[in-house]
């Protein structure tokens, strides 16, 4: 999809509503959004109501690419950092401090990519 944000890459590690909704708006404006989901089921919103792709999940994650990576795994964390290195925006809505404990907080990711816009929604 083309739009004013064509050429902008977003890494979305959000779940449920707020993070995915913010990333969805950017995708609607043309950004390439890569949704990072945990192994073992991904975004909990997937299974609401009608199985793997419930209507809420489809609505909030339309136009996104998806990849399964575990932020607790060193190798997968390196892959997340590589995504961030090549991206413009990082959106997360985890509990405060959760990604910092895993080495994926704003300070660390801005060291990987100094021009990164880091959006933390709580």
Question: Which role does the model predict for each range below?
Answer:
Residues 1-122:
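N-terminal helix-loop segment corresponding to the beta1-alpha1 unit
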